[in-house]
Swiss-Prot record:
This is ATP synthase subunit b-delta. PANTHER family: ATP SYNTHASE DELTA CHAIN (PTHR11910). Gene3D superfamilies: F1F0 ATP synthase subunit B, membrane domain (1.20.5.620), N-terminal domain of the delta subunit of the F1F0-ATP synthase (1.10.520.20). Keywords: ATP synthesis, Cell membrane, CF(0), CF(1), Hydrogen ion transport, Ion transport, Membrane, Multifunctional enzyme, Transmembrane, Transmembrane helix, Transport. The gene is atpFH. It holds the Pfam family ATP-synt_B. Its main location: membrane. The lineage of its organism: Bacteria, Bacillati, Actinomycetota, Actinomycetes, Mycobacteriales.
Length: 446
């Protein structure tokens, strides 16, 4: 019995424990599970609602998309039609513009081609004419005939007056011109008393004094002070050169410094000019003036075609003695004998360049030699040598036209083809065949 009671008590305890601890826990678990199931059912219902709404939205979106697509297609069709119309109108305008531009371009090209053809035809005509002229004047008789025809035309020209150009006077102002004229006139009288040796010595001493004055600028300035009383200037030049030069040279220097000069350099130019007049007086006494003039002009032309020689002779960095030695070597190697007066004149000129280009100085010297006889220099260009009769006739015609004796300096240039080119001072008479062809070519259209 007690066993039964004990078992019953144990069962009761177990039931109590189950009821006390297990049942509440299981109840809570069941309640939580029920809540979870209910929540899942609610979520499923909400999801079903959302699915339905999504289906409706999808259907509506499809309908809206179809409607929008239809609208876009219609707008695109309208825009395409409008763009097509605009492009068609623009194409018409562009086609018209291109057509007009093409017409203008065709006109322009036609004008250019016409002008080019005219130009080429003109150049070809001039070229053919040049060939015909060259072939024509290949015969010396025909070439000489062109000179004769030009002389006939020149002979018919109205006489024109021309004064003798005294190169040094042209460089000076009025006071120096008067002084130089007076000095040269005085020297012309004084030179009559000097013999060959006296004139040669005088020329050399004057060049030495001119070089001295060129180096001593202060002394030259005192010698050209424009004072009425020339005594101080005369005493200064006497103290400077007495015992170093001869009496004729000292007398020339006294006379020179007693004059009034417009510029300091004019006194040096005047002294150099008198030295040249002394040498030219020697040539005139020996009847060699024409030879001297011709050789001076010939040497001037040599310097024009030999620039290297001109540079060497005009290099003032080299002592004057060295340049003079070079000049004398060149003259010694000349094909023909050079007149001693020419050698002296050129040597003195190279010594007294004073910064001037040697080719200009030599040409100036040649013009001084010509002007001494009151002659006009005519620079004549010809395609070939003139005959004696043509040269004589040219000299006579030019002398009659200009009213003064004329010295002809002939320059041969085969490129002139025929006729003559004459330059007297600033006046140029160009009757060459080459100039006429060049003028014809210059008149061609650009």
């Amino acid at each position: 019995m007690s066993t039964f009671i004990g078992q019953l008590f144990g069962f009761a305890v177990i039931v109590y424990l189950v009821w006390r601890f297990i049942v509440p826990l299981v109840g809570r678990l069941m309640s939580a599970r029920q809540d979870t199931v209910r929540q899942q059912l609610a979520d499923a219902a909400a999801a079903a609602d959302r699915l339905a709404e999504a289906s409706q939205a999808h259907t509506k979106a499809l309908e809206d998309a179809k409607s929008e697509a239809h609208r876009v297609v219609e707008e695109a069709r309208t825009d395409a039609e409008r763009i097509a119309e605009q492009l068609e109108a623009q194409a018409d305008v562009e086609a018209e513009r291109i057509k007009m531009q093409g017409a203008r371009q065709v006109d322009l090209i036609r004008a250019q081609l016409t002008r080019q053809l005219r130009l080429e035809l003109g150049h070809e005509s001039v070229r053919q004419a040049r060939e015909l002229v060259r072939n024509h004047v290949a015969d010396q008789a025909q070439q000489s005939a062109t000179v004769d025809r030009f002389l006939d035309q020149l002979d018919a020209m109205a006489p024109a007056t021309a004064d003798v150009d005294y190169p040094l006077l042209a460089k000076m102002r009025s006071a120096s011109r008067r002084a130089l004229t007076s000095l040269v006139d005085w020297f012309g009288t004084m030179a009559q008393d000097l013999d060959h040796q006296g004139l040669t010595t005088l020329a050399g001493e004057l060049v030495s004094v001119a070089r001295l004055l060129d180096r001593e600028a202060v002394v030259t300035r005192y010698l050209t002070v424009p004072a009425e009383d020339a005594t101080p200037r005369i005493r200064l030049i006497e103290r400077l050169v007495s015992g170093k030069v001869g009496a004729p040279t000292l007398e020339v220097l006294r006379t020179a410094v007693s004059k009034r000069w417009s510029a300091n350099s004019d006194l040096i130019d005047a002294i150099e000019h008198v030295s040249r007049q002394a040498l030219l007086e020697l040539a005139e006494r020996a009847g060699q003036v024409d030879e001297v003039e011709d050789q001076l002009f010939r040497f001037s032309r040599i310097l024009d075609v030999q620039p290297r020689l001109a540079i060497l002779l005009g290099d003032c960095a080299v002592p004057a003695e060295g340049r003079v030695r070079l000049l004398r070597k060149v003259l010694e190697r000349a094909d023909s004998t050079v007149n001693p007066v020419v050698v002296a004149l050129l040597s003195h000129t190279v010594e007294l360049l004073r910064g001037q280009a040697v080719e200009e100085a030599v040409l100036f010297l040649a013009e001084v030699a010509v002007a001494r006889r009151g002659e006009i220099v005519a620079q004549v260009g010809a395609a070939a040598e003139l005959s004696d009769a043509q040269r004589t006739r040219l000299t006579e015609v030019l002398s009659r036209i200009y009213g003064h004796p004329v010295t002809v300096q002939l320059h041969i240039d085969a490129a002139l083809l025929g006729g003559l080119s004459i330059a007297v001072g600033d006046e140029v008479i160009d009757g060459t065949l080459s100039s006429r062809l060049a003028a014809a070519e210059a008149r061609l259209p650009d």
